[in-house]
Every structure is written in C-alpha cells, then in structure tokens.
C-alpha cells in the first residue's frame, strides 16, 4: 500500500508499508501544530485507561486516555478490554509501529507488530460505530482501518488537527494526561513512519 504525505499543495514523499491494515489516510493537507486542549478533568463517567510506554527498554512515561463510551460505547469497550487484557489478548507488549511527526502515532497491532494484524474483541473486524466525534486537535484517539467498517485493534493518537479524517475514522477518545509522552513517541518517528527506536506499550489497564 502506497500513501502520499502532503503538506499543503507540495508533495513531500510517499509512504510504503505492508499490504494490510495500515492507517488508511488521504493526503495530509497541513503540517501545522494545533493548540487544542481537552482539559484535565471530566465528570462524564467515561472509562479512563492508561498506556505505559518505553523506547528501547527505557521508560517514556504514562499516557492516560478518556474513552468516550457515552458517544461510541462499542468502540470504547473494545479499546478498554484490549487495555485490560481481560479477553486473553490485548495491547500489552505491542508496539507503536508507525509514527509520523506532525501527524500521528499509530499502534495496536499486537499479532504482527507491523500494521498488518490485530483483532477486536468482537472478532477480526467490526463496523464503524458513528462519526460524531471529530479529529479536532492534538491528543485525539481514533481507529485505524483499511477502509469502511474494518475496525480491529489498531488505533492512532493525533499530534495535530486532522479534520480531513472526519467521516473516515472513528474518534473514540482523547489524551487526558501524558501528551508530553506522546510528543516523546513522536520524536522517534519519521516521514516514512519508521521509528528510530522500538516503542513498546510495556503495561496498560483501566484506572476508572
């Protein structure tokens, strides 16, 4: 699969990767960093989960995510259960296999670790739940896919506003704490998506 990476009208390069469920993206229209914030507290009652992340065996820190179960309950439950590992499989020990600075950090392939695998708690794939939530800024948590209704376990965290993905990828949460850790992950990425260090989810689970 070949994916074009654009900043405005200028073609910066082509991204190549294994043929499968890489984050399927149209041309990137902008490379500006947003300043959006989701706040530090919530009274929604939505689940809070965490990802502890390391790079080449060195801890980077913890990312805490709020899952929008009030808007996309099925998608949120899939991610929550993959964080806890309660179904017998999940994100612990898997990698951020594709990281593009000023764009996004992609992870969730816990079977092949390269963007070609992963599975949901509902089976191999499940449908797009809805597109009510938008890719409004840094810290947005969204599902990677290989086209409509092909959600599995792969996800990405945006590091800029990516509104051209609205209606194509299901947003289901956002970073509550640890955006500095996301930026550290981003620093090991490249325009091709290949990371300079092995970035691993060393632990994960549910906080509330």
Curated annotation (Swiss-Prot):
- GO BP: apoptotic process; cellular response to arsenic-containing substance; cellular response to calcium ion; cellular response to hydrogen peroxide; mitochondrial outer membrane permeabilization involved in programmed cell death; negative regulation of apoptotic process; negative regulation of ATP-dependent activity; negative regulation of intrinsic apoptotic signaling pathway
State the EC number(s): 5.2.1.8
According to the record, the signal peptide region is none
Q: Which CDD domains match?
A: cyclophilin_ABH_like
- Regulation acting on activity, per entry: Binds cyclosporin A (CsA). Is displaced by CsA from the mPTP leading to a lower open probability of the mPTP.
A Pfam family reported for this protein in Swiss-Prot or TrEMBL: Pro_isomerase
- PROSITE patterns attached here? CSA_PPIASE_1 (PS00170), CSA_PPIASE_2 (PS50072)
**Could you cite one Gene Ontology molecular function of this protein?**
peptidyl-prolyl cis-trans isomerase activity
- Residues bearing PTM N6-acetyllysine: 68, 168
Family per UniProt? Belongs to the cyclophilin-type PPIase family.
Name of this protein: Peptidyl-prolyl cis-trans isomerase F, mitochondrial
Look up and give the organism this protein is from. Answer: Bos taurus (Bovine)
The gene is PPIF
